[in-house]
Structure formats: C-alpha cells, structure tokens
C-alpha cells in the first residue's frame, strides 16, 4: 500500500482533462492511501515580499506570515510523507497553472525541502516519485514550446524528486477527433506505467 498525494491544478472543474485522467488513475489505486489537493479551490496565497520573508522563518513574524508558514509546513509534510505525488500540470499559455506555481512557491523552502552546499543545491525530499499529467491544446512534446516538462523536471529535481514520469494528452484544442486520440494515448501511457 502506497501513500499517494494528488495535486489537481486545472481551473476547468468538471471539464478538466487532467482531472479526468487522474480520476481514472486513482480508480486503479483504491487500496492505496490517497490525499487529494484541488489547488484551484484551495486559494493558496501568491508569493510576495512579505510572505517570502516569512517563509525564511524568524522570531518576529506577523499573523499573515505565521499562517502561511503553518500552511507551508502542512503541504511539505504531505509531500514528504508520500511515496508518489501525482501532479496535474495542464499547459496554460505555455506554462503551468498559477495555482500549481503557488503550491511550488510554498513547498520550495531552503533548509526544509532543499539546501545549498558548496557543490550546489541538494534536494531534501527523499523516496518520493512523481507522475506529471499534462494536457495541452496543441502538439508541444519535444518542441521549444513545451516549457512545462523542463520546468517541472527541474523544480522537482531541485527538491530531491528525480524519478519523474510524464503523461501527455495533446491536441485537446484541435477538435473532437484529436481530443479523443490524445486522451486515449494518455490513458494508454498510464496503463503501461508500473506505479
């Protein structure tokens, strides 16, 4: 039995292809312990100067900083306690959803999920794999317009998650036939993963 953390980030609700793919994946993992975070409804704060300063810690934190520090600690504990994190990362304007970026800003903390050394940064999230599910309106895999894959691989690797699989559902905005084909290909990729 595995501990699975699921991060949904689509703003499309019931029309979300990434949510539908995740739900299909979870149907095959009912014996696992699953925590689902819908980042689109969680209203995580956008990082600003006050919050960035607060996330570094200290003795003189204000109420807002203390609340966000507690929220960050909770999100990090969920992540570190997971064997697998399943991340919905649909491509919006060549990037990830703001809601997912807000989560990343709260869990990427020096001394907590990574540390700097003389030889470079070292990730502190250990024994966790990641599965990134990324629907896209067009065809972007392997091209310069795919900014999602290198970003997610880099940020996850930076905090210590090196074992990352990507599932792509491409052509979601190219008509019903392309959409159906993209969904079927993504489902096929999910079925072949040994997770």
UniProtKB/Swiss-Prot annotation:
Its cofactor is FMN. Its EC number is 1.6.5.-, 1.7.1.17. InterPro entries: Flavodoxin_fold, Flavoprotein-like_sf, FMN-dep_NADH:Q_OxRdtase_AzoR1, NADH:quinone_OxRdtase_FMN_depd. GO terms for molecular function: electron transfer activity; FMN binding; oxidoreductase activity, acting on NAD(P)H as acceptor; oxidoreductase activity, acting on NAD(P)H, quinone or similar compound as acceptor. It comes from the Bacteria. FMN binds at residues 10, 16-18, 91-94. It is an enzyme of class 1 (oxidoreductase). SUPFAM superfamilies: Flavoproteins. HAMAP family: Azoreductase_type1 (MF_01216). This is FMN-dependent NADH:quinone oxidoreductase.
